């Protein structure tokens, strides 16, 4: 019996954390659900189609405008006008996909949270069509809350109880959900912790990167910046680019090698939404041609990125899923974060003191945290090693919950 799972909020292109979540869900659910096929409602349909190597994954365009206006309107019409349903299924790929789905997985990384009200309409639009078609909605491990803001609290109280299951990504999110009175929650860990390496990453990277850079003796310090953090730091009067450039130069002057790698990329596109390539190119230009410096000016897959990050000695990042990759590969990490979603993941490893926010950003702070990581290397590696198996198990457990809901639909 074929089971059909629709997915929204993730992608193969752009943010490689979203790619890791998508690929992890396909891998884990394909082994738990018989004859599983998947439909991705894509914000970047052309780019995702170009990268789609999955025979059982269909890509359907769902750009913000199309999702918010067309798909939501048709889904509402489907609900209130039963006589039009055959026509709607025949005329709209999106409605046909939803109507045949056993569940919709919402893989947004952080939704329904105070301070991000400009994304609230998209958060609602992502799940409302499925709710109107009475398709079970499962919010894969993600951060939600806090709910102190009037608009966000209202929307959360209206829509989140209608979701079949919310997988909370950490203790802070779970406490926020409890405080809102939600009872449809289960504890989990980010789906990207379930991503497994295929084993061919080195071979696939060799034509793209000189891997002798990470093979040679000595320390390699990795840097994965974020345009989101750049806006937050610069908005406070800081200088994110210059701060990281100076940190990289200081790393090189200390005799270490420095690897600059974008974890969110849209090749051939200069827009910076979910695209750190332009930022990384600016940083690389400022650093210049220096011995021991390597900039990865490529769009790598989530598995290639994880392999490469795993070859570093220490890692500095402002990208959430770059942090997931470094922790998954047991690499001591400095996190420059902007919300509770970073803290609650580091809490799983007892490493919440290894992060700081935009207000504290400076070259001196980055270098001080790197020095502290170097000093505490054995202790930090032991903390990651002792907690990683349980975190991965918690991540994979959401696949069991999803499979139960999907198979129950038949």
Tell where the protein language model's regions lie, with residue ranges.
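Active-site anion-handling motifs in enzyme catalytic cores
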Residues: 1-410
């Amino acid at each position: 019996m074929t089971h059909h799972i629709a997915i929204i909020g993730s992608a193969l292109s752009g943010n490689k954390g979203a790619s890791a979540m998508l690929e992890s869900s396909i891998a884990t659910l394909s082994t738990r659900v018989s004859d599983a096929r998947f439909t991705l409602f894509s914000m970047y349909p052309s780019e995702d189609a170009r990268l789609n190597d999955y025979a059982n994954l269909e890509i359907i365009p769902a750009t913000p405008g199309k999702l918010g206006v067309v798909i939501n309107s048709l889904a509402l019409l489907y609900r209130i006008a039963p006589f039009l349903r055959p026509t709607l299924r025949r005329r709209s790929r999106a409605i046909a996909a939803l109507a045949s789905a056993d569940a919709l997985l919402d893989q947004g990384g952080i939704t329904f949270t105070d301070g991000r009200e400009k994304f609230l309409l998209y958060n609602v639009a992502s799940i409302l069509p499925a709710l109107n078609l009475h398709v079970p909605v499962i919010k894969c491990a993600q951060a939600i809350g806090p709910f102190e803001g009037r608009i966000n609290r209202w929307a959360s109280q209206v829509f989140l109880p209608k979701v079949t299951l919310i997988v909370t990504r950490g203790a802070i999110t779970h406490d926020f959900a409890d405080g809102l009175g939600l009872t449809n929650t289960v504890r989990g860990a980010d789906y990207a912790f379930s991503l497994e390496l295929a084993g061919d990453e080195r071979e696939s990277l060799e034509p793209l990167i000189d891997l002798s850079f990470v093979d040679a003796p000595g320390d390699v310090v990795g840097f994965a910046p974020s345009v989101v953090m750049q806006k937050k730091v610069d908005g406070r009067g800081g200088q994110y680019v210059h701060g990281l450039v100076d940190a990289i130069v200081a790393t090189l002057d200390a005799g270490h090698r420095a690897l600059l790698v974008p974890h969110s990329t849209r090749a051939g596109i200069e827009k910076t939404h979910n695209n750190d390539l332009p930022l990384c190119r600016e940083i690389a230009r400022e650093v210049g041609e220096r011995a021991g410096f390597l900039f990865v000016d490529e769009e790598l897959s989530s598995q290639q990125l994880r392999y490469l990050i795993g070859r570093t000695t220490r890692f500095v990042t402002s990208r959430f899923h770059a942090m997931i990759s470094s922790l998954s590969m047991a690499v001591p990490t400095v996190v420059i974060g902007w919300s509770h979603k970073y803290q609650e993941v580091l809490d799983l490893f007892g490493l919440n003191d290894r992060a700081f926010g935009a207000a504290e950003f400076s070259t001196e702070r980055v270098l001080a945290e790197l020095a502290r990581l170097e000093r505490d290397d054995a202790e930090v590696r032991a903390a990651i090693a002792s907690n990683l198996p349980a975190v991965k198990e918690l991540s994979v457990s959401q696949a069991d919950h999803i499979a139960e809901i999907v198979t129950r639909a038949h």
